Amino acid sequence: MEQDKIQHGTTSANNNPVKNNGINLHMFSELSAQFEQYFNKRHFPALPATLYDAAQYLLTVKGKRIRPVMCLMSNELFDQINKDAWHVATAIELFHNFTLVHDDIMDKAPLRRNMPTVHTKYGESTALLAGDVMLVAAYESINKIDSAFIHSVLAIFNETSKKVCEGQQLDIDFEKMSSVSFEDYENMIGLKTSVLLAASMQMGAVLGGAGLGNQQHLYEFGKNLGLAFQVQDDYLDAFGNPEKFGKKTGGDILANKKTFLLIETMNKCSASHKKELMELMQHQHNDDNKIDKVIGIYKSCKVDEWAKELKQKYMAKALMHLDDVAVLSLRKKPLEQLAHYLLDRES
């Protein structure tokens, strides 16, 4: 790939990107700020307030907005970002928050983004309805598309929605199983987490007029980046610095949650380690001793090093597909930098 040079993160006084060789490029931080301003509005009617205030509540608690911004970045690979991409980015964020509301109910989670979850604040019945109207609002946003690509976008969006539900059900099924294969777990994460990143990239490309080959490469870029992102999440929960991670480590261990680390350890460690680990996972007490023992087993089995290698494997595959996208390499630099940032993060 040709090594074009770009001055990253440089903007003019009005926060528009500076032209580099005649090409306008936005970095993630720039588009994230622009999307936040675009998205930060009332998405629902005033009444009944008991329903729509609950739906609006989570949207006002700022998240990373990774998925909608990746849609915009994918769209910009092919030309200036068009208004249809903003509608789809909004739909993606609404859909993502819909899944969070329902996931939190299923997980009985008390907090989301350090704030009470929707069902904790408003009750489970209202939270279910609030999630439902978010999904409806997502489709309303897609219906605002003017271009001839609306049918293609809807097909991708519908298929993605179905896959996310399939992934969530597999996750629920795995909770009842004593062991899960790496392949089955990878498939579940691919459906539950990665597919929305992949679809965000593909829909942005479709709206940019990309051909099927470029669409597929960007889909695979998003999919593998999502898998690498999950490996990093699992790694940080066990081995991260709590001050940088933003919360106490070991949460997945205390919750007996199946992760890449646990799956690999159960499948590859010695019989004695496996027995000890199974006994610990049946231990319901939330204490640091359990966390320390499980992490000790992880280190003995060297799954910390394995996780780093697995993350790099997914990362390399993602970047390979990005490299194969048939646009100027200069245009791909912001996505390449974003990929490295997401996977080198410590929080």
Each predicted region: which residue ranges?
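All-alpha prenyltransferase/terpene-synthase fold signal
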Residues: M1-S347
